[in-house]
Amino acid sequence: MPELPEVETVRRGLEPVITGAKIISITLNRRDLRFPFPEAFSERLVGRTIMELGRRGKYLLFHLSQNETILSHLGMSGSWRIEDDLLRKTYSAAGKFVKHDHFLMDIQAKDGKVYHLTYNDVRRFGFMLLLDTNRIYEHPLLKKLGLEPLSNEFSGRYLQEAFVNKKISLKGVLLDQSIIAGLGNIYVCEALWRSRLSPQRGAFTLALKTVCAREFADSLAQNIRNVIAEAISFGGSTLRDYIRTDGSLGYFQHSFSVYGREGKECFQCGIPITRISQSGRSSFYCSQCQK
């Protein structure tokens, strides 16, 4: 599933072109994704202006004129791409990026040039909703999201407060979107390795009123920030279906220290990386370095 760095990379790829653009036409190649498209979706969008493209956690927010917002979630395999006429003809001629195109939006940018914005989703777990912009953060999907890991408020102290009395694993708490918005399995594994913390460790141990606990919490918060920022700078991680808005791949997967490296040597101590299952998800860690 695309995590915060992948979604932010998409946002940054689309934003310069679509901000201020007018929606010319909409084509729906099916009636639904994970959920049905909003009623009269095409008719309600044509003629609108895309005022701003935002992100909250793993959600993209296309803020439109007339105070409505398209909330887009990429699901497991969704991707957005943007093409001009020449690039679109090249892709079509090559038969590339045509299958599983479910939503197509033609827009006219502020400079008058026409672009084609396409949503592709092999597994169709993504979805789009059309919401009232003024009340969007009251929607159940957004209302309970935690802090953004790159926000000024995110810190070791915040983590300590969030971990109080949490008897479950550190990995489980870090994946809780009501605590940290947008953080997923890949980047939790990477941040924990950098912090030398086991994914099986009880989260409450970082909330203890000791110097050691505070230092671990500060280190973890900083490493989460660093991993997320680095992944964004590399254009995210491509494991299976994720692509950037120009059709290219992300590159952060080449910088993984533990994720997907079961049996390979730990870069720190040399012993094999271990994979375990936690709540149905794979955790990768070094049993020697991470305690």
Swiss-Prot record:
The keyword Calcium does not apply. Its EC number is 3.2.2.23, 4.2.99.18. One of its GO terms (molecular function) is class I DNA-(apurinic or apyrimidinic site) endonuclease activity. A zinc finger (FPG-type) spans 257-291. Its cofactor is Zn(2+). PROSITE patterns: FPG_CAT, ZF_FPG_1, ZF_FPG_2. The keyword Transcription regulation does not apply. Keywords: DNA damage, DNA repair, DNA-binding, Glycosidase, Hydrolase, Lyase, Metal-binding, Multifunctional enzyme, Zinc, Zinc-finger. The active site is at 2 (schiff-base intermediate with dna), 3 (proton donor), 58 (proton donor), 281 (proton donor). It catalyses: Hydrolysis of DNA containing ring-opened 7-methylguanine residues, releasing 2,6-diamino-4-hydroxy-5-(N-methyl)formamidopyrimidine; 2'-deoxyribonucleotide-(2'-deoxyribose 5'-phosphate)-2'-deoxyribonucleotide-DNA = a 3'-end 2'-deoxyribonucleotide-(2,3-dehydro-2,3-deoxyribose 5'-phosphate)-DNA + a 5'-end 5'-phospho-2'-deoxyribonucleoside-DNA + H(+). DNA binds at residues 100, 123, 166. CDD domains: EcFpg-like_N. Transmembrane segments: none annotated. Binds 1 zinc ion per subunit. One of its GO terms (biological process) is base-excision repair. It comes from the Bacteria. Involved in base excision repair of DNA damaged by oxidation or by mutagenic agents. Acts as a DNA glycosylase that recognizes and removes damaged bases. Has a preference for oxidized purines, such as 7,8-dihydro-8-oxoguanine (8-oxoG). Has AP (apurinic/apyrimidinic) lyase activity and introduces nicks in the DNA strand. Cleaves the DNA backbone by beta-delta elimination to generate a single-strand break at the site of the removed base with both 3'- and 5'-phosphates. Monomer. NCBIfam families: fpg, PRK01103.1. This is Formamidopyrimidine-DNA glycosylase. It comes from Bartonella quintana (strain Toulouse) (Rochalimaea quintana).
